[in-house]
Curated annotation (Swiss-Prot):
Any GO molecular function: magnesium ion binding
Protein name, entry field: Ribulose bisphosphate carboxylase large chain
Organism: Calycanthus floridus var. glaucus (Eastern sweetshrub)
Keyword Lyase recorded: yes
Binding residues annotated for Mg(2+), in chain numbering: 201, 203-204
Length: 475
């Protein structure tokens, strides 16, 4: 080795591996208003100190790698590195802790959920020094949220488009989810809308299969919408699923929906991807279409308590990427959802300013500034007996969606829709009169069923149906 090379190697650079905590654990750091803040639930491998594990998360999700590199000297690590600035224990879990990490805003591309997640929940989740890692929450600063367009329209604009106020909206997923012909599918849509529902919905896995191609489904559903509107005098909609194998095909389907004059389309935002979702949201905003979002695949990511990503993070990401509705659990139905946690991310979807509240799983105060809100959709195993609880839990700004709870009515689809509409109107009227829905809910439904034979039949069919399993996702 030449003397010249030896001299260079000795100036400002020392090859080798050093502990992450020496660079990325900074307990004295004061967070900035422009930082993206993350709360990670960390389960390190035995023998790995909490400070080292937290620093490793900050490093591997920002500027760090496993060894010191020459090119560190060509940038300012102090400006660009993520910092683990606080560590706190998890009650009842000796081997876990919450690591708080601050990321400088310049690490992220403007208006790109894809880029944000590629860093924060990228390779770090496969890091060997960690047994498990879960992203519990993010604080998105206004400086970053203002680079996103957000929901295509938002709650108030949707109500104005539909001319529906003062109550939750009612929906229904057409069942069986797969196997119907386009004409029979359209007939079911018509019967449900005529019976009193505001919306019907494609199931998430209805795209363009051999038994029902997308164009045929769109045509028959549009016919059902316009016929039911003419008969009822109400504005109706059907969530036409535009999800496809390519972004180009997805946009083509949305264009056809717009040409038909329908009010709303749908996207599976996790299986379709955030880039596709944001592209579709931009199209919907520019062309007057509402956008319904289904969260298929979310439980793969968010259901395990120790690893993955909490749904409140996915909900925040969706609000930035763009959607007017998103499925958010039911609390009372067949799908996962603990009450306080669910209400926490429902507020994150709808409200402008949400205070930190650890009792509901909210780790950071979130300020959305002027970004429109998203309507939470309660769907999955719900029926007329759940209507008082759903009305009380979710309030007016929500969509209550009954699939089997409409189409499973013993008299058919239209009577099933009538039963749900009567139950909802009864609950809203009782609430407006000052009655307690949580305490008097069953009595309110029984009273309404005395003058609605459709509701009485529904009450009889589902009087014994319960889904009583302990929620996996608890505080």
């Amino acid at each position: 080795m030449s003397p010249k090379t030896e001299t260079k190697a000795g100036v400002g650079f020392k090859a080798g591996v050093k502990d992450y905590k020496l660079t990325y654990y900074t307990p004295d750091y004061e967070t900035k208003d422009t930082d993206i803040l993350a709360a990670f639930r960390v389960t390190p491998q035995p023998g790995v100190p909490a400070e080292e594990a937290g620093a490793a998360v900050a490093a591997e999700s920002s500027t760090g790698t496993w060894t010191t590199v020459w090119t560190d000297g060509l940038t300012s690590l102090d400006r660009y590195k993520g910092r683990c600035y606080h560590i706190e224990p998890v009650a009842g879990e000796e081997s876990q802790f919450i690591a708080y990490v601050a990321y400088p805003l310049d690490l992220f591309e403007e208006g790109s959920v894809t880029n944000m997640f590629t860093s924060i929940v990228g390779n770090v989740f496969g890091f060997k020094a960690l047994r498990a890692l879960r992203l519990e929450d993010l604080r998105i600063p206004p400086a970053y949220t203002k680079t996103f367009l957000g929901p295509p329209h938002g709650i108030q604009v949707e109500r104005d488009k539909l001319n529906k106020y003062g109550r939750p909206l009612l929906g229904c997923t057409i069942k069986p989810k797969l196997g119907l012909s386009a004409k029979n599918y359209g007939r079911a849509v018509y019967e449900c809308l005529r019976g009193g529902l505001d919306f019907t919905k494609d199931d998430e896995n209805v795209n363009s299969q051999p038994f029902m191609r997308w164009r045929d489904r769109f045509l028959f559903c549009a016919e059902a919408i316009f016929k039911s509107q003419a008969e009822t005098g109400e504005i109706k909609g059907h969530y036409l699923n535009a999800t496809a194998g390519t972004c180009e095909e997805m946009i083509k389907r949305a264009v056809f929906a717009r040409e038909l004059g329908v009010p709303i389309v749908m996207h599976d935002y996790l299986t379709g991807g955030f880039t596709a979702n944001t592209s579709l949201a931009h199209y919907c905003r520019d062309n007057g279409l509402l956008l319904h979002i289904h969260r298929a695949m979310h439980a793969v990511i968010d259901r395990q308590k120790n690893h993955g990503m909490h749904f409140r993070v996915l909900a925040k990401a969706l609000r930035m990427s763009g959607g007017d509705h998103i499925h958010a659990g039911t609390v009372v139905g067949k799908l996962e959802g603990e009450r306080e946690i669910t209400l926490g991310f429902v507020d994150l979807l709808r409200d402008d300013f949400i205070e930190k509240d650890r009792s509901r799983g909210i780790y950071f105060t979130q300020d959305w500034v002027s970004m429109p809100g998203v309507l939470p959709v309660a769907s999955g195993g719900i029926h007329v007996w759940h209507m008082p609880a759903l009305t009380e839990i979710f309030g007016d700004d929500s969509v209550l969606q009954f699939g089997g709870g409409t189409l499973g009515h013993p008299w058919g689809n239209a009577p099933g829709a009538v039963a749900n509409r009567v139950a909802l109107e009864a609950c809203v009227q009782a609430r407006n009169e000052g009655r307690n829905l949580a305490r008097e809910g069953n009595e309110i439904i029984r009273e309404a069923s005395k003058w609605s034979p459709e509701l009485a039949a529904a009450c009889e069919v589902w009087k014994e149906i319960k889904f009583e399993f302990e929620a996996m996702d608890t505080l």
